[in-house]
């Protein structure tokens, strides 16, 4: 399956006017602008993340891999994708989920206003073991180096699934990783991901969404960063082997 939608839900991202370093100004919530960039990348085939797995419910693991994909020639037909050899697949083992709902988040690490917007997958579903992995979310943004992360989604049918619905990717993104991710916003220009997350000047304007900075013990270090959550869906594609 190929991800056909993706939206940043938390943290919200804010643009700061730093023309005068002594007078920083909170300009705008640009979360939807970034989501527009993500959506354009997917729609145009510039970003193709494939979710590959065996027949449900016998599936034990999923593979997340970049693909080279072509849009369908006729409306309603599936995309045609070839798994890419340019980057290694992310192999994630699955854990059993007996509860009716499948995500396993701590809502207290997210903004209260964002929690109702997070996808809440139900059965039948797949949930990966919690762990550390690096996953590209866009050709424009790059790969997120996540800790304590999980990939969760419902299937539209337990026997012959054609879609992943109500998907949620969540985990902790360390500051050092977010600082190395740069994306281009229309009008606003290039920004590092961390520069639109760590925005204390915006807190008074958006008190129910900020602050979003947190910490996580990583080995012997209490690392600053942010807990993030991304909604997604995926659709079945035709897999074409590489020539």
Where are these regions (language model features)?
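Extracytosolic secretory-pathway proteins
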Residues: 1-243
């Amino acid at each position: 399956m190929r991800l056909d939608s993706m939206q940043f839900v938390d943290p919200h991202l804010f643009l700061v006017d730093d023309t005068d370093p002594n007078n920083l100004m909170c300009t705008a919530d640009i979360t939807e602008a970034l989501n527009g960039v993500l959506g354009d990348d997917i729609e145009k085939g510039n970003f193709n993340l494939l979710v590959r797995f065996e027949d449900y419910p016998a599936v034990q693991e999923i593979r997340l891999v970049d693909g080279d994909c072509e849009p369908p020639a006729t409306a309603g037909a599936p995309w045609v994708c070839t798994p890419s050899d340019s980057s290694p697949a992310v192999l994630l083992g699955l854990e059993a989920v007996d509860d009716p709902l499948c995500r396993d988040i701590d809502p207290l690490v997210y903004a209260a206003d964002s929690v109702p917007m997070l996808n809440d997958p139900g059965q039948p579903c797949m949930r990966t073991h919690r762990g550390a992995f690096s996953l590209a979310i866009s050709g424009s943004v790059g790969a997120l180096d996540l800790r304590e992360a999980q990939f969760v989604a419902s299937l539209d049918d337990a026997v012959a699934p054609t879609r992943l619905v109500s998907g949620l990717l969540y985990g902790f993104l360390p500051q050092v990783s977010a600082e190395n991710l740069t994306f281009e916003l229309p009008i606003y220009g290039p920004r590092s991901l961390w520069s639109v997350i760590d925005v204390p000047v915006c807190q008074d304007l958006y008190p129910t969404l900020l602050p979003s900075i947190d910490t996580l013990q990583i080995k012997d270090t209490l690392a600053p960063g942010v807990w993030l959550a991304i909604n997604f869906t995926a659709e079945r594609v035709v897999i074409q082997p590489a020539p």
